[in-house]
Amino acid sequence: MDSKVVIYTDGACSGNPGPGGWGALLKFNDASKKIFGYELVTTNNRMEMTAALEALRVLKKSSIVEIYTDSKYLQHGITVWIHNWMKNNWCKNNNEPVKNVDLWQKLYSELSKHTIMWRWVKGHASNSGNIAADKLAVQGRETAMEILKCRG
């Protein structure tokens, strides 16, 4: 039987684009795992997507996954828009290319490995999982900012 995992994800960016971070809190039964990372120049949407992607990559076996995100871009993109984008060769209905195709394709490849429910949660509210993911994302962003500061 597949194991159940609950994941909270978030992204943070100073400027858009700018230094950014992503974070995720994974909960399995009685255990939890926190992960975070950064990019020196990125966007808020890329960090939101990276948080979900990296969290899914942590999972070593097929799982039933609930992903909570405060990004409607991520939730709608992966559950609604992606199917048309793929049919349209990664173009939107107005023939403009879809942004972040590299990450959408990587996320899509993770879908076949798990049963995933994508849930939207209001950001910066009272959801403890989202608050924890936000703190991790901010930690990643601050790391990126420190690196840039050291480089002058």
From Swiss-Prot:
GO molecular function: magnesium ion binding; nucleic acid binding; RNA-DNA hybrid ribonuclease activity
Domain RNase H type-1: 1-142
Gene3D superfamilies with a match to the protein in the record: Ribonuclease H-like superfamily/Ribonuclease H (3.30.420.10)
Alphabetical keyword list: Cytoplasm, Endonuclease, Hydrolase, Magnesium, Metal-binding, Nuclease
Record function comment: Endonuclease that specifically degrades the RNA of RNA-DNA hybrids.
Record-stated family: Belongs to the RNase H family.
PANTHER family per the UniProt record, alphabetical: RIBONUCLEASE H1 (PTHR10642:SF26)
Name the record gives this protein: Ribonuclease H
Organism: Rickettsia typhi (strain ATCC VR-144 / Wilmington)
Organism taxonomic ancestry: Bacteria, Pseudomonadati, Pseudomonadota, Alphaproteobacteria, Rickettsiales
The gene coding this protein: rnhA
